[in-house]
Amino acid sequence: MLNDLYEEIKLRKTQPREGSYTNYLFDKGLDKILKKVGEEATEVVIAAKNNEQELIAEVSDLTYHLLVLLAEQNIPLSKIQAELQNREGKLSTTRDRKEINDL
């Protein structure tokens, strides 16, 4: 499903459709896309304190905007998948992850 959505987003970049929100983001450029990613990430944090449906909706929005960002930067989704697979099964401790203790 994410692959299909990513492919559709990439298609909008090369074959714009009038009135498309995705094309609006591409037309406005990287700064607008980054602003939306930041807004949606904040909304995820807030939604996590509320209810499940709101969290699902906000995570979906964030995921979409992250895919737009990847397409804007010409980063294939396969590189993200490869990075996640590379991390699978790796052990780390809180000592290895300084940022955990800083929260």
UniProtKB/Swiss-Prot annotation:
SUPFAM superfamilies with a match to the protein in the record: all-alpha NTP pyrophosphatases (SSF101386)
UniProt entry keywords in alphabetical sequence: Amino-acid biosynthesis, ATP-binding, Cytoplasm, Histidine biosynthesis, Hydrolase, Nucleotide-binding
EC numbers, comma separated: 3.6.1.31
Catalytic EC class: hydrolase
GO biological process, one term: L-histidine biosynthetic process
Gene Ontology CC, one term: cytoplasm
Lineage: superkingdom: Bacteria
HAMAP family associated with the record: HisE
Name by which UniProt lists this protein: Phosphoribosyl-ATP pyrophosphatase
